[in-house]
Amino acid sequence: MHNYKLTIQYDGARFKGWQRLGNNDNTIQGKIESVISEMVGKEIEIIGCSRTDAGVHALNQVANFQSDEKLVEHKVKKYLNQYLPNDISITNVEEVHDRFHARYNSKAKTYLYKIWNEEHTNPFMRKYSMHVNKKLNVKSMKAAAKHLVGSHDFTAFSNAKSKKKSMVREVYTLDVMEEAGFVQIRVSGNGFLHNMVRKIVGALIEVGLGQLDAEAIPNILEEKQRNQINCLAEASGLYLENVEF
């Protein structure tokens, strides 16, 4: 059995997310599986490292699949890019150890979130950022972000779909940056609960708008109540930026 690792970029705007929900429906996983299965002449299942939601984008998603026959990597890449829609791109294909698992072997993930922070809309970025038309207090957002770095129970920053045995995750870095009309948030950690990144961004937006005190974050973490963060940041601004193994 041969195991192949795919590195993938996609514009998630028109898709229902990464995870296949039915028989090769409009998902990233479904589209890629359909083309690979056609290529090898049998049904193939791929495993992604991150099950991104509808509307979320990826600069470096990683997946793997297994094949009975040995495949030529550059030919696989060429075939996939020829037949996949042009909002999905395979940037690399390589054969890896048979025990490599894209989801379970990942050690760290980095997400980038883009906020368009001008009074006027940006029509070119409406599918690729969240528009906040009131000026954000980035200094306060940075102060709040410091409280979220480290190992914590992130129940308050998840949604009801998160049914993990442990809600503890470690955030390695959480940076807030201003750049040419944008406020960008980059977060790295050992793993993230469902909607955790979007809830973190939502909390930072609330802080930036003066709706939440930065010093309230430790209490929110401690109390573990999901209803304390009212803002779930839009999917459109979220990018899976990098995965480390």
Swiss-Prot record:
InterPro entries, A to Z: PsdUridine_synth_cat_dom_sf, PsdUridine_synth_TruA, PsdUridine_synth_TruA_a/b_dom, PsdUridine_synth_TruA_C, TruA/RsuA/RluB/E/F_N
Catalysis: reaction(s)? uridine(38/39/40) in tRNA = pseudouridine(38/39/40) in tRNA
Keywords assigned: Isomerase, tRNA processing
Cite the binding residues for substrate.
111
Please give one Gene Ontology molecular function term for this protein: RNA binding
Q: What is its EC number?
A: 5.4.99.12
Which GO biological process categories is it annotated with?
tRNA pseudouridine synthesis
- Fill in the subunit field for this protein: Homodimer.
NCBIfam families for the chain: hisT_truA (TIGR00071)
Summarize the protein's role.
Formation of pseudouridine at positions 38, 39 and 40 in the anticodon stem and loop of transfer RNAs.
Name the family the entry cites: Belongs to the tRNA pseudouridine synthase TruA family.
- By what name is this protein known? tRNA pseudouridine synthase A 2
Organism of origin: Bacillus cereus (strain ATCC 14579 / DSM 31 / CCUG 7414 / JCM 2152 / NBRC 15305 / NCIMB 9373 / NCTC 2599 / NRRL B-3711)
- Lineage, please? Bacteria, Bacillati, Bacillota, Bacilli, Bacillales
